[in-house]
C-alpha cells in the first residue's frame, strides 16, 4: 500500500502543481484583460475629452463669429444712421439763415475750379439767393442740384458740381472708421 500512497501523493502533488500553474495563468490572463480594458477605457476617455474640447473650441469660435457679425451689423447700422442724419440735416440746411454764406463759398470754389464759367446752376428754390451772390455769370435753374451749385464751363460740355451732399459722399469712406470707433465707445 505504501506504493499506492506514494503514487497517490505524487499524483496529488502533480494535480496541485497543475492547478497552481493554471491559477497563475488564469490570473495573468485576467490581469492582461484588465490592463487591456483599462487601456481601452483610458483611450476612449482621452478621445471623448478631446472631442469635448474640440466642441468647446468650435462653439466659442461660432459664438465669436456671431458676436463679431452682430457688432459689424450694429456698426454698419449705426454708421448708416449717422449718414442719414447728416443727409437729413444737409437737406434742411438750405432753409437756414446761414445758407447764403455756405452757398456763396460753394459758388466761389466752383468759379475757382472753372474760371471761364458760362453759367451757374442752382436749385430753383435757391435762385433768389444765388442771383444776389453772383455777378457777371448767368444763373440758371437746375432741379437736380440740391444744396449747392454746378458751374458750367463755356460751351456747356464740362463743369463742376459743388454740393454739400457731394462733399459728404467724397468723405464717407474716410469717415466710416472714425464714426464706427466713436459709436463703439
From Swiss-Prot:
Summary of the function given for this chain in its UniProt record: Produces ATP from ADP in the presence of a proton gradient across the membrane.
Family, per entry: Belongs to the V-ATPase E subunit family.
HAMAP family: ATP_synth_E_arch
GO terms of biological process kind: proton motive force-driven plasma membrane ATP synthesis
Name of the coding gene: atpE
Molecular function terms, GO-annotated: ATP binding; proton-transporting ATP synthase activity, rotational mechanism; proton-transporting ATPase activity, rotational mechanism
Organism: Deinococcus radiodurans (strain ATCC 13939 / DSM 20539 / JCM 16871 / CCUG 27074 / LMG 4051 / NBRC 15346 / NCIMB 9279 / VKM B-1422 / R1)
SUPFAM superfamilies: V-type ATPase subunit E-like (SSF160527)
Pfam families for the chain: vATP-synt_E (PF01991)
UniProt entry keywords in alphabetical sequence: ATP synthesis, Hydrogen ion transport, Ion transport, Transport
Protein name: V-type ATP synthase subunit E
InterPro entries the UniProt entry points to: ATPase_E_C (IPR038495), ATPase_V1_Esu (IPR002842)
GO cellular component assignments: proton-transporting two-sector ATPase complex, catalytic domain
